[in-house]
């Protein structure tokens, strides 16, 4: 996260909503930079960022409770535009002289707004007398609005669904404009950012790239950087950005643990060495990893073994290089946002990649994290800006522990080889059908189950392969992809005919929730 003021930015105060990150995504989609800060440190964040507008998130808390989160007075005193969402509306009303009460009718899900008065925020979007779908999720409700406010829209259970004090540029809604279930929500946020706050949408990846290169050079100086290259989008984009900044001062290490997709390690090495002229060390550690994983069936034990072996292997290679002062990582913004706790202070949740967790402390290195202000979709845009091919940028997500967690039960070399072939055929059929970009993630799973089959004149007793494909926006929720049966039949036939060791194929039709996307 930036440590300095950022011109033309928006500050988002997080009161603990599960969808606060969606607010940030909507703001950035308008070409405007924003940051999320927990309510406990909102004054410091406000002073540091020096934003031109403030958005208040929802919350699981009740504005009626003693000690519930509040907006610092300095923000109201600043004269900046404020947009309160759900709990954000309730705390505005509670703090500025309105009234909030526990709702007798909790309102969750789809609702319809009736537009009663016009305002600048509605320009080019809504008109008086029109009706629009929104998404509600609240128990408490506003029952009296503060002096200076007027009601702009109502719903059947929320008589103050949309209120505003246009003189002070305060807008507050009971619904959630940031979610896709409010069709006009993104445009509302855009109107607030551009029309009300007057911020120009000129934040771009090319500008971010130039700034990041400058910051990396200032941080690293003439020192050396090593970067763990996994072959994924995040670590690859981070490595290219660092390389653009410091050139030969960067060395990348690709630890090949034998758990990647078919030909993946070779393809990554070829791309980075030949096309980008990166100093890349390819470590063949397949025997080391697979040897220790053989027979291990517990998913968490698999992860711990992979993480430990990666650190050991990486340390050994780094020592051969004579060490380095900095470690490059592809940490993203969702990994560093502070989560909000109502039982105490904020707890910082760093979702350390299984490969690099603990490396900086163990090796006495400082971190270079050039992507820590970006969301995943923004990293893909930056990757394109840096010249990575669309076929690489648009690849489906792949888990850190790789194929080890797509082999439920014990891992063996034979099972990994069988799975790798089945997965490659499945993805090939998806691409041939023109479905790859319509699916968020697709993969094969080799089940620890063998079944009887008949192939030719002989009886077989071989593994079952499960195929998985989901649609999703961010991986938090997902629905199984609805293939036609002809496609599934074609993919299954190829896998059974071409992969020795599989005689039955099934398709997973579980959504998330209740299931998860991966099987382990």
Curated annotation (Swiss-Prot):
Mind listing the GO molecular function terms for this protein?
ATP binding; GMP synthase activity
PANTHER family named in the record: GMP SYNTHASE [GLUTAMINE-HYDROLYZING] (PTHR11922:SF2), GMP SYNTHASE-RELATED (PTHR11922)
Q: Which reaction does it catalyse?
A: XMP + L-glutamine + ATP + H2O = GMP + L-glutamate + AMP + diphosphate + 2 H(+)
Name under which the protein is recorded? GMP synthase [glutamine-hydrolyzing]
Q: What does the subunit comment say?
A: Homodimer.
The UniProt record lists the GMPS ATP-PPase domain at 203-395
Kindly state one GO CC term assigned in the UniProt record: cytosol
Instruction: Provide the alphabetized UniProt keywords.
Output: ATP-binding, Glutamine amidotransferase, GMP biosynthesis, Ligase, Nucleotide-binding, Purine biosynthesis
The question of whether ATP-binding is a record keyword is answered with yes
Please indicate which superkingdom the organism of origin belongs to: Bacteria
Q: Which gene encodes it?
A: guaA
RNA-binding among the record's keywords? no
Q: Which residues form the signal peptide?
A: none
The active site lies at 86 (nucleophile), 176, 178
List of residues binding ATP = 230-236
Report the protein's function: Catalyzes the synthesis of GMP from XMP.
Q: What is its EC number?
A: 6.3.5.2
| Domain Glutamine amidotransferase type-1, first and last residues per copy | 9-202
Under InterPro entries, the record lists: Class_I_gatase-like, GATASE, GMP_synth_C, GMP_synth_GATase, GMP_synthase, GMPS_ATP_PPase_dom, NAD/GMP_synthase, Rossmann-like_a/b/a_fold
Pathway connected to this protein: Purine metabolism; GMP biosynthesis; GMP from XMP (L-Gln route): step 1/1
Top-level EC class:
ligase
